[in-house]
UniProtKB/Swiss-Prot annotation:
Similarity-based family: Belongs to the bacterial histone-like protein family.
A Gene Ontology biological process term: regulation of translation
Key words of the record: DNA recombination, DNA-binding, Transcription, Transcription regulation, Translation regulation
Record region (Disordered): 55-74
HAMAP family named among the record's database cross-references: IHF_alpha
NCBIfam families recorded: himA, PRK00285.1
Entry function: This protein is one of the two subunits of integration host factor, a specific DNA-binding protein that functions in genetic recombination as well as in transcriptional and translational control.
Protein name per the record: Integration host factor subunit alpha
One GO cellular component, as annotated: cytosol
Subunit record text: Heterodimer of an alpha and a beta chain.
Amino acid sequence: MTTLTKADLAELLFEKVGLNKREAKDVVESFFDEIRLALEKGDIVKLSGFGNFQCREKPQRPGRNPKTGEEMPISARRVVTFHASQKLKSQVEGARIGTPSQE
């Protein structure tokens, strides 16, 4: 298994779309900045055929220190969730490991 990084995405844009390396890096950075900004505002980000990102507020809840067993509150927080689209799930499920999808 390998890891796909932002630098890898920029390199793929350079190779497949023909952007120069600086433009490709800027496109990737801008893409993720826009997603982050939308999530910070509380918007839902829907990427058709891929999935949805959204923020959820998690309330404070009781917790326990694993070392001491002492009860302590876990603070309220905001978390990002991702739900894959049915299309993405089907494509990933149908793909054989090590062979990229042709779509």
